[in-house]
């Protein structure tokens, strides 16, 4: 399993880091088989798995439950778990309780937190307690209400400078990596050059140290539309619907199950059971 040291070395050597979300045993197992470097159990599970309109309703219990499943499916992959909405915008003591629960109960190797400001002290606090932290700047889904929706961040010089400052503060506080979401590629490149920790981009262009996408977006599974920054590498959704539709049709017309899908009794047992009457 790759570690923080490996990711730092990959950045130094210019080897891109691959990260993918996973939310359950099968998706994690497939991600590991595909040799993904890092798995993110994102609070995006609220939208793509649980059917919520945002990540806000996701709880600490949800994150623990799904991370445990992911750990069972990807035992040799570094796993990062999101701290959900309002689980770390509380007192440092309560933040530690939530963080401890997620790490101890789920087996996550690191936690991800969104934003800067007071979150910088949270990163420092958790790091000092021995919990690796991944920071997340740019578009932070838990704060879309404050940001005015899902919009690109850092498009003007002033806000870009603020993001650069925040990125440096995240590193100084002890973050082991930084996710940059929906920021101009020029800004992402500049931030990546000024940090020693890896930057993982999602809608941040090529000049970052790694990329992350949502599992369901990448394979077109249960999603009707995807953001501009997503490339869909396959469409399992069409195959799944086709397969289920065929199953429904064959059951309705009694084509399924066939004899080869059924079990039989020996003739003498049939006679003993109901006098040999067979349907």
Curated annotation (Swiss-Prot):
GO process terms (BP): pantothenate biosynthetic process
Q: Can you say where in the cell this protein is located?
A: Cytoplasm
Q: What class of enzyme is it?
A: transferase
Molecular function per GO: 3-methyl-2-oxobutanoate hydroxymethyltransferase activity; magnesium ion binding
Positions binding Mg(2+) in this chain are 43, 82, 114
Against InterPro entries, the record matches this protein to: Pantoate_hydroxy_MeTrfase, Pyrv/PenolPyrv_kinase-like_dom, Pyrv_kinase-like_dom_sf
Where on the tree of life does the source sit, at the highest rank?
Bacteria
A Pfam family that the UniProt record links to this protein: Pantoate_transf
Q: Which residues are catalytic?
A: 181 (proton acceptor)
Q: In which pathway does it act?
A: Cofactor biosynthesis; (R)-pantothenate biosynthesis; (R)-pantoate from 3-methyl-2-oxobutanoate: step 1/2
Give the EC number(s) under which this enzyme is classified: 2.1.2.11
List the cofactors.
Mg(2+)
GO CC list: cytoplasm
What reaction is this protein's catalytic activity? 3-methyl-2-oxobutanoate + (6R)-5,10-methylene-5,6,7,8-tetrahydrofolate + H2O = 2-dehydropantoate + (6S)-5,6,7,8-tetrahydrofolate
- Which UniProt keywords are present, listed alphabetically? Cytoplasm, Magnesium, Metal-binding, Pantothenate biosynthesis, Transferase
Record's SUPFAM superfamilies?
Phosphoenolpyruvate/pyruvate domain (SSF51621)
Q: Which residues bind 3-methyl-2-oxobutanoate?
A: 43-44, 82, 112
For this protein, what does the record note about how its cofactor is bound?
Binds 1 Mg(2+) ion per subunit.
Q: Which family does it belong to?
A: Belongs to the PanB family.
**Function of this protein?**
Catalyzes the reversible reaction in which hydroxymethyl group from 5,10-methylenetetrahydrofolate is transferred onto alpha-ketoisovalerate to form ketopantoate.
- Oligomeric form and interacting partners: Homodecamer; pentamer of dimers.
**What is the protein name given in its UniProt record?**
3-methyl-2-oxobutanoate hydroxymethyltransferase
- According to its UniProt entry, this protein's organism is Bacillus anthracis
Organism lineage reads as: Bacteria, Bacillati, Bacillota, Bacilli, Bacillales
Gene encoding it? Answer: panB
């Amino acid at each position: 399993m790759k570690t923080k040291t490996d990711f730092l070395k990959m950045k130094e050597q210019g080897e891109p880091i691959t990260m993918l979300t996973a939310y359950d045993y099968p998706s994690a197992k497939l991600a590991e088989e595909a040799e993904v470097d890092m798995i993110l159990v994102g609070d995006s599970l609220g939208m793509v798995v649980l059917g919520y309109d945002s990540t806000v309703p996701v709880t600490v219990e949800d994150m623990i439950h799904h991370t445990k499943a992911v750990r069972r499916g990807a035992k040799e992959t570094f796993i990062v778990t999101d701290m959900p909405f309002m689980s770390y915008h509380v007192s440092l003591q309560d933040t530690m309780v939530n963080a401890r629960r997620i790490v101890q109960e789920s087996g996550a190797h690191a936690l991800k937190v969104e934003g800067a400001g007071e979150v910088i002290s949270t990163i420092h606090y958790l790091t000092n307690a021995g919990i690796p932290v991944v920071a997340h700047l740019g578009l932070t889904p838990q704060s879309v209400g404050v940001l005015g929706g899902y919009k690109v961040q850092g498009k003007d010089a002033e806000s870009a400078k603020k993001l650069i400052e925040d990125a440096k503060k995240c590193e100084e506080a002890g973050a082991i990596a930084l996710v940059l979401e929906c920021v101009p590629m020029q800004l992402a490149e500049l931030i990546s050059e000024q940090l020693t920790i890896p930057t993982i981009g999602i809608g941040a262009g090529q000049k970052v140290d790694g990329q992350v996408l949502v599992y369901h977006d990448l394979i077109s599974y249960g999603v009707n539309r995807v953001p501009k920054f997503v490339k869909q590498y396959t469409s399992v959704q069409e195959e799944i619907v086709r397969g289920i539709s065929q199953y429904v049709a064959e059951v309705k017309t009694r084509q399924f199950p066939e004899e080869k899908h059924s079990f039989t009794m020996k003739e003498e047992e049939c006679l003993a059971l109901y006098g040999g009457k067979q349907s």
